């Protein structure tokens, strides 16, 4: 957990990946810092302070989801994104709203489990290597065949075989030590070994996906799994692959799942972030049955956001201190079209601005994961060094902005489409090109994109 970041530091970290949207960054930075402040309070006062949920308003592709996702990643908090339109009112077929909390807990369990695996990794690998030694050079007990019960009872012939057995033990021990050295030195990585692994059984409840009954299926499967023996199967793998499989198995054995569950539920309750996208799609006046159904979903979401207990397979989870970030474009509706009770649960309102040509230029080159950097790295694997002139980058940004204006405005996502079309021929022929360095000029951009961008009928299908 990295809750010690100040709001300014959080904004600076977000600036490395997201261009603009200062208001949204400040809002989430303050929300995160308040969690740190709350953790320092006395318990009686801490219980009274709930997070201030955030409503982000802005068109698609301007960074609403990315701000929330990067914020969660920055502090290592459990984070999930759900779409409000996927939920149905209680009593109808579809996902119930409580599933978002169950998904959050599952994410939290996965995060904690991965952290625990890292802690026991060295010990797990050591035990996996011991199992590999046992497979390559079985111990005398496993090599020995059937023993006569009378011989075991009366000890007849034991003395006569004792010397031979002792010599065999010494020889086998030498072999085991030799194999251990070779394994440590990586000299046996390509050797093929036969190992027994736990078989991954396909779930008979996959058919329940999307029906709202997944939790019932999972609980039933867990109940069955607790008393049904796990199946194993033999697999032939190289030592390198076998070590990975065995290390994973040993790590799972070393982890205390009760400890994982306890920590995961705590993190989900105290640090969890749920991003509810497309909340504008369930807003509307009660003019028809569809809007009434949408209001039903809002009323189902309300107790989750207000604070309630949700039953999960890991136990009851309180939602009182989970941070909810809702987002929507609100083209066809307004935030005031949400039911008043739900509006009141999102006191912080942030409006994200549309992206300009200058924003597109910055998005292409400034973030740590900028698109230009990605394409340069991809083509470098083919031995080709490409560079973009400043004028070419400006031209790409102008075309992306213009296509957004002429067709549907999908924000920064338009740049992905533009860049793919621009470098389509180069990517296709990269393995055959003999040139080591290629410069992308405004003329090249014009040649590849201008004709398509100017033709609205074509651009809406291609770009």
From Swiss-Prot:
Q: Name the keywords, alphabetized.
A: ATP-binding, Chaperone, Cytoplasm, Nucleotide-binding
Name of the featured protein: ATP-dependent protease ATPase subunit HslU
Q: Which InterPro entries does the UniProt record give?
A: AAA+_ATPase (IPR003593), ATP-dep_Clp_protease_ClpX (IPR050052), ATPase_AAA_core (IPR003959), Clp_ATPase_C (IPR019489), HslU (IPR004491), P-loop_NTPase (IPR027417)
Quaternary form? A double ring-shaped homohexamer of HslV is capped on each side by a ring-shaped HslU homohexamer. The assembly of the HslU/HslV complex is dependent on binding of ATP.
Q: Which organism is it from?
A: Bacillus cereus (strain AH187)
Subcellular location(s): the record lists: Cytoplasm
Does the UniProt entry include the keyword Nucleotide-binding? Answer: yes
> Which terms in the Gene Ontology molecular function aspect does this entry carry?
ATP binding; ATP hydrolysis activity; peptidase activity; proteasome-activating activity
Q: Please describe what this protein does.
A: ATPase subunit of a proteasome-like degradation complex; this subunit has chaperone activity. The binding of ATP and its subsequent hydrolysis by HslU are essential for unfolding of protein substrates subsequently hydrolyzed by HslV. HslU recognizes the N-terminal part of its protein substrates and unfolds these before they are guided to HslV for hydrolysis.
Q: Which residues are ATP-binding?
A: 19, 61-66, 277, 341, 413
């Amino acid at each position: 957990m990295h809750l010690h970041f100040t709001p300014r530091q959080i904004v600076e970290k977000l600036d490395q990946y997201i261009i603009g949207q200062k208001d949204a960054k400040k809002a989430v930075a303050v929300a995160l810092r308040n969690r740190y402040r709350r953790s320092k309070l006395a318990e009686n006062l801490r219980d009274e302070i709930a997070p201030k949920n955030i409503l982000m308003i802005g068109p698609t592709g301007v960074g609403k989801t990315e701000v929330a996702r990067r914020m969660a990643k920055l502090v290592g908090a459990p984070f999930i994104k759900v779409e409000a339109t996927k939920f149905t009112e209680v009593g109808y077929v579809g996902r119930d709203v409580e599933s978002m909390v169950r998904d959050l807990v599952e994410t939290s369990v996965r995060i904690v489990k991965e952290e625990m695996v890292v802690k026991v990794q060295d010990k797990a690998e050591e035990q996996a290597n011991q199992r590999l030694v046992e497979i390559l050079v079985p111990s005398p007990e496993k090599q020995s065949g059937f023993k006569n019960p009378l011989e075991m009872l009366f000890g007849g012939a034991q003395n006569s075989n004792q010397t031979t057995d002792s010599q065999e033990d010494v020889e086998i021990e030498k072999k085991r030590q030799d194999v251990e050295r070779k394994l440590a030195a990586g000299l046996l990585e390509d050797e093929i070994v036969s190992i027994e692994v736990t078989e991954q059984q396909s779930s008979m409840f996959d058919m329940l996906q999307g029906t709202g009954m997944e939790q019932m299926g999972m609980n039933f499967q867990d109940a069955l799994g607790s008393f049904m023996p796990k199946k194993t199967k033999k697999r032939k793998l190289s030592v390198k692959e076998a070590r990975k499989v065995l290390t994973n198995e040993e790590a799972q054995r070393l982890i205390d799942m009760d400890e994982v569950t306890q920590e995961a539920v705590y993190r989900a309750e105290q640090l969890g972030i749920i991003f509810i996208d497309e909340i504008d799609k369930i807003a509307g006046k009660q003019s028809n049955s569809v809007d009434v159904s949408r209001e039903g979903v809002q009323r189902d979401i309300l107790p989750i956001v207000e604070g309630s207990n949700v039953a999960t397979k890991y136990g009851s989870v309180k939602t009182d201190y989970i941070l909810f970030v809702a987002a929507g474009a609100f083209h066809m509706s307004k935030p005031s079209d949400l039911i008043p009770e739900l509006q009141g649960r999102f006191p912080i309102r942030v409006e994200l601005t549309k992206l300009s040509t200058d924003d597109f230029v910055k998005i292409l080159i400034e973030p740590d994961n900028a698109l230009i950097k990605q394409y340069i790295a991809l083509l470098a694997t083919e031995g080709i060094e490409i560079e973009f002139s400043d004028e070419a980058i400006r031209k790409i940004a102008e075309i992306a902005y213009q296509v957004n204006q002429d067709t549907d405005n999908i924000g920064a996502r338009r740049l992905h489409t533009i860049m793919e079309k621009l470098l389509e021929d180069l990517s296709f022929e990269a393995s055959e090109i003999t040139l080591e360095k290629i410069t992308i000029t405004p003329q090249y951009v014009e040649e590849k994109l201008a004709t398509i961008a100017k033709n609205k009928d074509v651009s809406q299908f291609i770009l």
